[in-house]
C-alpha cells in the first residue's frame, strides 16, 4: 500500500464532493431549449442515473459519467472505488456495461505520475471485473486529484429501470449498508481505527451487478443507486418523480459497523448538512442521529429498489443467489400532500 495520503490533497471526498441538490437545481435551469430528440428515452428531466437512447430493435444505449476527488488515501483503492461508482449507474438503469473511458485530473507538480498510474490501474481492474475494456480517456493538469469514468452500456428498452416509476404499495430494499460518508470522514480526520479501515472500501468496491438481474423482473418498478445525496435525497427523487411517499423503518436500515461510534466522535461529513439544507423541509421529523444517517453522502452506495409484492420473492431469490441477504426497509404509498418521507424509529 502506498504511503501517500491522497485525501490530504483534496477539499472534498468521493460523492461528498457533489454540488448540493438545491444549488444544482439552479445551475441546471436553462433559458436555452434543448434539442428535441425523439430517440432520447431517458434524459435529465427525471434526475435519473444515466441517459438512454433508443437505437432500434428494442435496444437502448445507456450513457453516464461520474468522477470525484479521493475518498481514501491509497491510490489503487481510489481508482477501484471511482470506477465501481461510475459503472453503477449502468446497473441502476438495468443495463449491461460495454465500454469505459477514463477521466483524470492530476496535480502534476505535486503528485508523481506513478501515483496516477496506480489510480488508473485500480480503475482498470474494476473494468476487468465488470467485463469491459478501459478503452481510453482524457487527462488534464488539475489543482486536486480527480478520477472517474464515462461508461457506455446497453439495455433492452422493456427492461429499463428509472427512478421515477415507483408505485404505491411497492416494498423498498437497499443492497449496501449506509455510513460510508461517516467512516471516510473519520479517515480524513485521522480518527479511523486501523481495524476499521476496510469497512467502507469493501462496500464501495462491490459492483452493483445485481441490478442487471433485478431488471429482468417486471415487478421491479423503479431503481436508483444511493450516492452523494444520501438515502433521503435519492429516495426523495424517487418519491417526487413517482407521485408517492415513503415510510421507512429506521431499525431495518443496513449500517456499516461502528457508524454510531464515529458519529459520537463528530465524524459527520459537510455534505450531510448540505443535503439536509437542500431537502430537509420535505422530510418528516427526525432526530440528529437519524438525520446524520439518512443524509449521509454515500460513495459507490447500494441500489435502492422499489418492487411490487408480485416480484418480491423472485427479487429475494436473486439476491440470495448472489450472496446478498436483504430485508425490506420500507414501503411506498400514494402521496398525500405532506412530507415525502416518514422515518419510524
Swiss-Prot record:
Binding site for Mg(2+): 49, 89, 225
Catalytic reaction equation(s): hydrogenselenide + ATP + H2O = selenophosphate + AMP + phosphate + 2 H(+)
Sequence positions that bind ATP: 18, 46-48, 66, 89, 137-139
Single Gene Ontology MF annotation: magnesium ion binding
Residue(s) at site: Important for catalytic activity: 18
One Gene Ontology cellular component: cytoplasm
Any one GO BP annotation for this protein: selenocysteine biosynthetic process
Needed cofactors: Mg(2+)
Cofactor details (free text): Binds 1 Mg(2+) ion per monomer.
Biological role: Synthesizes selenophosphate from selenide and ATP.
Family: Belongs to the selenophosphate synthase 1 family. Class I subfamily.
Subunit and partners: Homodimer.
Name the UniProt record assigns to this protein: Selenide, water dikinase
Organism whose genome encodes this protein: Aeromonas salmonicida (strain A449)
Gene: selD
Amino acid at each position: 500500500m502506498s504511503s501517500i495520503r491522497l485525501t490530504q490533497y483534496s477539499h472534498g471526498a468521493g460523492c461528498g464532493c457533489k454540488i448540493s441538490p438545491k444549488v444544482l437545481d439552479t445551475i441546471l435551469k436553462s433559458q436555452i431549449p434543448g434539442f428535441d430528440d425523439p430517440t432520447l428515452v431517458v434524459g435529465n428531466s427525471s434526475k435519473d442515473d444515466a441517459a438512454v437512447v433508443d437505437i432500434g430493435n428494442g435496444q437502448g444505449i445507456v450513457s453516464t459519467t461520474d468522477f470525484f476527488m479521493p475518498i481514501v488515501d491509497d491510490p489503487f483503492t481510489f481508482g477501484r472505488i471511482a470506477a465501481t461508482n461510475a459503472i453503477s449507474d449502468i446497473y441502476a438503469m438495468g443495463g449491461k456495461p460495454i465500454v469505459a473511458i477514463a477521466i483524470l485530473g492530476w496535480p502534476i507538480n505535486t503528485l508523481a505520475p506513478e501515483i496516477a498510474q496506480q489510480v488508473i490501474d485500480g480503475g482498470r481492474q474494476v473494468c476487468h471485473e465488470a467485463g469491459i475494456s478501459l478503452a481510453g480517456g482524457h487527462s488534464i493538469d488539475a489543482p486536486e486529484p480527480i478520477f472517474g469514468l464515462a461508461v457506455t452500456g446497453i439495455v433492452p428498452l422493456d427492461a429499463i429501470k428509472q427512478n421515477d416509476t415507483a408505485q404505491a404499495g411497492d416494498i423498498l430494499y437497499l443492497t449496501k449498508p449506509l455510513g460510508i460518508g461517516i467512516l471516510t470522514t473519520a479517515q480524513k480526520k485521522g480518527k479511523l481505527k486501523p481495524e476499521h479501515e476496510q469497512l467502507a472500501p469493501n462496500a464501495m468496491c462491490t459492483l452493483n451487478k445485481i441490478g442487471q438481474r433485478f431488471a429482468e423482473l417486471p415487478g421491479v418498478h423503479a431503481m436508483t443507486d444511493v450516492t452523494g445525496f444520501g438515502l433521503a435525497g435519492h429516495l426523495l427523487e424517487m418519491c417526487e418523480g413517482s407521485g408517492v411517499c415513503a415510510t421507512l423503518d429506521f431499525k431495518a436500515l443496513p449500517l456499516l459497523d461502528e457508524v454510531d461510534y464515529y458519529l459520537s466522535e463528530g465524524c459527520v461529513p459537510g455534505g450531510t448538512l448540505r443535503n439536509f439544507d437542500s431537502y430537509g423541509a420535505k422530510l418528516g421529523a427526525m432526530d440528529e442521529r437519524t438525520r446524520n444517517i439518512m443524509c449521509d453522502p454515500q460513495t459507490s452506495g447500494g441500489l435502492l429498489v422499489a418492487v411490487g409484492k408480485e416480484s418480491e420473492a423472485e427479487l429475494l431469490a436473486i439476491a440470495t443467489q448472489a450472496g446478498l441477504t436483504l430485508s425490506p426497509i420500507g414501503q411506498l404509498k400514494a402521496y398525500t400532500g405532506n412530507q415525502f418521507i416518514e422515518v419510524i424509529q
